[in-house]
Curated annotation (Swiss-Prot):
GO CC annotation terms, alphabetical: ribonucleoside-diphosphate reductase complex
Subunit organization: Tetramer of two alpha and two beta subunits.
Record site: Allosteric effector binding: D185, R215
EC category: oxidoreductase
Regulation: Under complex allosteric control mediated by deoxynucleoside triphosphates and ATP binding. The type of nucleotide bound at the specificity site determines substrate preference. It seems probable that ATP makes the enzyme reduce CDP and UDP, dGTP favors ADP reduction and dTTP favors GDP reduction.
Disulfide bonds: C178-C415
Protein encoded by which gene: nrdE
Site (Important for electron transfer): Y692, Y693
The protein's name in its UniProt record: Ribonucleoside-diphosphate reductase 2 subunit alpha
Enzyme Commission (EC) number: 1.17.4.1
Length: 714
């Protein structure tokens, strides 16, 4: 009888990959076959997941076995009574969760769930994974564990990959895997950087390095002229380190390097990404970022020469590293100072070269240095970003002795990320609780992270308690509500949604500081402590400009913060402080978007039915969230929508986000380097902080996979 049933199942159920592929084929009426993808989910669960899952007679037996066999971390479970743990697992399994798309289910079972050590059988379903994440992050707090479970199962909150993947496992990686480190202009710092690249890449980390402080090619060493090799050999060493330490062969290490636009090596730096670059200088796997101050744009407008300053001389004359000097502010005096060597380059030629390289490779990322620092409420200077260009935090230099031991441990940066699904968050029965739970969950990631192999990362995290609460599914939500991406209603909603998120996130951080009697280091020197930060919200009219958006917030039962609420929050923050130095950052969200059935981040879809290359599996198809055959007109893709509307949307969010947002620009295949330059200038004028990749329509044919940091993009 069992054989007959199996035969019937095979006959009735098409191969789940074939069913999923039918998303890419219209039916006889010319309609997209959304039902085939739902059938693919059912077939995948029935014919692959269930037959390959280990079953237990009870949850108690399951937990005992997983602990005894070394799968679950017993210390996580021991913070609670076993009765509570079993009750929470039972609660999770009665939530009614089901995957909305085949790609979501496929991603979860191939990349996230706990498997037997031979990799052949599944030990968790989605509810199990969520429960273990909640138990880990709540650290013994039963109320928080229940709230985290509900927020994740409802699809409102989704921790980033390293957290969601590793929580509760006995054999696990770090809960965070995105790092930013400075390199100073000495061999000890360079040596430490290569070691840090190895250590962090071994742990699956994506690491960005600041190169701006390194002396240029031809600079003196010990006063002997023309001795320095510049930044390119350091880039080569870092690239080799990432290639070597590739997480047990599972994934190539991921690295990025940032260089200031006024560094003398800037053109050589950019040329490393040319398709026809000499192999001696070509950089194949490192991501590149350029830090551009306001003065560069002003010089380009005037068609003037831009000076490139020797970091060696600037540090010698100013007594501080090049990256810590505000170039726009000191530009004229740097030009006039004869003690500082300089080269000259036409500013428009620089932007032309920048666009040419982006046209060829999609790189470099851009950080608008002065925009970032004007918006920064924390004392100190921001001089770099990360592998996905959304982390923007202050850092400080470390010093080493000749043994590479620290004589002064500076502060480097790690990113503790997770995202809210905008559509489900707007549907939340308690918007305030959703945001508070997410902030508390991410704060737990910071509190639990100890990267001892790189002491400056450990010190920076301990001092800042920084987190990055992100957002996803903006396009999906707007389309569900009948709003076109980039329309006046869409911009109005984006502004007010992030406005509301900001108030609730800050309030939660204030509550954490009050509960713990502790703020982030440097709070007293911040614009939060002085109350200055809140001025923007105590002025102006922060209410809906369109009737449609007013209706959305009313229907969701969300009270937009009033001036009185902001004034009270300001007073509370000035009295108690805030616990987290940084609260928001919007990453690109790759795999977690698919699991959550969300559009990525806050940018538009790249296709109505996205085609993903999934390793040996080949092509997998993903339909945009909330899309039906009746509302297709609301699902213009990013190439059709164009750069300006994307920039306008990000500008509305940027005014509220204390860190950055991963902003990819999409261009049709008819675009020129002039179009790219115009978009860069428009983004600068609109107050955008960073630009991520440049994508041209023909590049999408190669596949839509994101090469970047697993913490952010996947």
């Amino acid at each position: 009888m069992a054989t007959t049933t199996a035969e019937c199942l095979t006959q009735e159920t098409m191969d789940y990959h074939a069913l999923n592929a039918m998303l890419n084929l219209y039916d006889s009426a010319g309609r997209i076959q959304f039902d085939k993808d739902r059938q693919a989910v059912d077939a995948f669960i029935a014919t692959h997941v269930r037959p390959n899952s280990v079953t237990f007679s009870s949850q108690q037996q399951r937990l005992n076995w997983l602990v005894n066999e070394g799968y679950y971390d017993e210390s996580v479970l021991n913070r609670y009574s076993r009765d509570f743990v079993i009750t929470l697992f039972t609660h999770a399994h009665t939530s009614g969760f089901r995957f909305q798309t085949f790609l979501g289910a496929w991603k979860f079972y191939t990349s996230y769930t706990l498997k037997t050590f031979d990799g052949k059988r599944y030990l968790e379903d989605f509810a199990d994974r969520v429960t273990m994440v909640a138990l880990t992050l709540a650290q013994g707090d039963e109320t928080l564990a229940l709230q985290l479970t509900d927020e994740m199962l409802s699809g409102r909150f989704q921790p980033a990959t390293p957290t969601f993947l590793n929580c509760g496992k006995q054999q696990r990686g770090e809960l965070v895997s995105c790092f930013l480190l400075r390199i100073e202009d000495n061999m000890e710092s360079i040596g430490r950087a290569v070691n840090s690249a190895l250590q962090l890449s071994k742990r699956g980390g994506g690491v960005a390095f600041l190169l701006s402080n390194l002396r240029e090619a031809g600079a003196p060493i010990k006063r002997i002229e023309n001795q320095s090799s510049g930044v390119i050999p350091v880039m080569k060493m870092l690239e080799d380190a990432f290639s070597y330490a590739n997480q047990l062969g599972a994934r190539q290490g991921a690295g990025a390097v940032y260089l200031h636009a006024h560094h003398p090596d800037i053109l050589r730096f950019l040329d490393t990404k040319r398709e026809n670059a000499d192999e001696k200088i070509r950089i194949k796997t490192l991501s590149l970022g350029v830090v551009i101050p306001d003065i560069t744009f002003h010089l380009a407008k005037e068609n003037a020469q831009m000076a490139l300053f020797s970091p060696y001389d600037v540090e010698r004359v100013y007594g501080k590293p090049f990256a810590d000097v505000a170039i726009s502010q000191h530009y004229d005096e740097l030009v006039a100072d004869e003690r500082i060597r300089k080269k000259y380059l036409n500013a428009r030629d620089f932007f032309q070269r920048l666009a040419e390289i982006q046209f060829e490779s999609g790189y470099p990322y851009i950080m608008y240095e002065d925009t970032v620092n004007r918006a920064n409420p924390i004392a100190g200077r921001i001089n770099m970003s990360n592998l996905c260009s959304e982390i923007l935090q202050v850092n400080s230099a470390s010093e080493y002795d000749e043994n590479l031991d620290y004589t002064r441990t500076g502060h480097d940066i790690s990113c503790n990320l997770g995202s809210l699904n905008i559509a489900h968050t707007m549907d939340s029965p308690d918007f305030a609780r959703t945001v508070e739970t997410a902030v508390r969950g991410l704060t737990a990631v910071s509190d639990m992270s100890h990267i001892r192999s790189v002491p400056s990362i450990e010190a920076g995290n301990a001092a800042s308690h920084a987190i990055g609460l992100g957002q996803m599914n903006l396009h999906g939500y707007l389309a569900r509500e009948g709003i076109a991406y980039g329309s006046p209603e869409a911009l109005d909603f984006t502004n007010l949604y992030f406005y509301a998120i900001t108030w609730h996130a800050l309030r939660t951080s204030m509550l954490l500081a009050r509960e713990r009697g502790e703020t982030f280091a440097g709070f007293k020197q911040s614009r939060y402590a002085s109350g200055e930060y809140f001025s923007q919200y105590l002025q102006g009219n922060w209410q809906p400009k369109t009737a449609k958006v007013g209706e959305l917030f009313t229907r969701s039962g969300i009270t937009l913060p009033t001036r009185e609420m902001w004034a009270q929050l300001r007073d509370d923050v000035m009295r108690y402080g805030i616990y987290n130095q940084n609260l928001q950052a919007v990453p690109p969200t790759g795999s977690i978007s698919y699991i959550n059935h969300a559009t990525s981040s806050i940018h538009p879809i790249v296709a109505k039915v996205e085609i993903r290359k999934e390793g040996k599996t080949g092509r997998v198809y993903y339909p945009a969230p909330f899309m039906t055959n009746e509302n297709l007109a609301l699902y213009q893709d990013a190439y059709e929508i164009g750069a300006e509307k994307i920039i306008d949307t990000y500008a509305e969010a940027t005014r509220h986000v204390d860190q950055g947002l991963s902003l990819t620009l999409f261009f049709p295949d008819t675009a020129t380097t002039r179009d790219i330059n115009k978009a860069q200038i428009y983004a600068w004028r609109k107050g955008i902080k960073t630009l991520y990749y440049i994508r041209l329509r023909q590049m999408a044919l190669e596949g839509t996979e994101i090469e970047g940091c697993v913490s952010c993009a996947l």
